[in-house]
Curated annotation (Swiss-Prot):
GO terms for molecular function: adenyl-nucleotide exchange factor activity; protein homodimerization activity; protein-folding chaperone binding; unfolded protein binding. The gene is grpE. Homodimer. Residues 1-32 are annotated as: Disordered. Residues 12-32 have a biased composition (Low complexity). The keyword Ion transport does not apply. Participates actively in the response to hyperosmotic and heat shock by preventing the aggregation of stress-denatured proteins, in association with DnaK and GrpE. It is the nucleotide exchange factor for DnaK and may function as a thermosensor. Unfolded proteins bind initially to DnaJ; upon interaction with the DnaJ-bound protein, DnaK hydrolyzes its bound ATP, resulting in the formation of a stable complex. GrpE releases ADP from DnaK; ATP binding to DnaK triggers the release of the substrate protein, thus completing the reaction cycle. PANTHER family: GRPE PROTEIN (PTHR21237), GRPE PROTEIN HOMOLOG, MITOCHONDRIAL (PTHR21237:SF23). GO terms for biological process: protein folding. This is Protein GrpE. Its main location: cytoplasm. It comes from Cupriavidus pinatubonensis (strain JMP 134 / LMG 1197). The keyword Methyltransferase does not apply. The lineage of its organism: Bacteria, Pseudomonadati, Pseudomonadota, Betaproteobacteria, Burkholderiales.
Length: 184
């Protein structure tokens, strides 16, 4: 006996394009198959289009995330730039004072006062506020007590400030070093 190759009665297309070609060349009795093949090809094209849109959306999301991280990194890196720019005139004044060899104490004092005003203005622009709590109640969040001294003031009141403190945007940058009145 001779083996006969059996061929399937309907072709099995490898791709949607082959299916469309096969459907177009099929006999009229397979007109329903033509419609199905055309629908299949259209749906496969639509699926490829949606997959492409999905891949692009994922890539765009990654790009947005990366750009946001870069923006945050730059913000951290250059956050002090504006404040440093405000300090440059103070440095210029100090360098001018050091370069002055006249020895005139009154002129030097005037220059130091001007420089202190420049520094205060730079602090103000940077929202740095000086803490000078003489006469206030002791606040451990804003003051650091160095010692207790006998005083006529109420107990736990700041008597003297040894070193001024500073806040920046209502956050303590450095607490004020103070002496506090002792209980009577």
């Amino acid at each position: 006996m001779e083996e006969q190759k059996q061929t399937p009665s309907t072709p099995t297309p490898d791709t949607a394009a082959e299916a469309a070609v096969n459907a177009a060349t099929a006999a009229p009795e397979t007109a329903g198959a033509d419609d199905v093949a055309a629908q299949l090809a259209a749906l496969e094209a639509k699926a490829r289009e949606h997959y492409d849109m999905y891949v692009r959306a994922v890539a765009e999301g990654e790009n947005i995330r990366r750009r946001a991280q870069e923006d945050v990194s730059k913000a951290h890196k250059f956050a002090i730039e504006n404040f440093a720019d405000n300090l440059l005139p103070v440095m210029d004044s100090l360098q001018a004072a050091l370069a002055d060899g006249s020895g005139d104490i009154a002129k030097l004092r005037e220059g130091v006062e001007l420089t202190a005003r420049q520094l205060s203005a730079a602090f103000e622009r940077g929202k740095i506020v000086e803490l000078n709590p003489v006469g206030e109640k002791f606040d451990p969040h804003r003051h650091q007590a160095i010692s207790m001294v006998p005083s006529e003031q109420e107990s736990n009141t700041v008597v003297t400030v040894l070193q001024r403190g500073y806040t920046i945007a209502d956050r303590v940058l450095r607490p004020a070093l103070v002496t506090v009145s002792a209980p009577k």
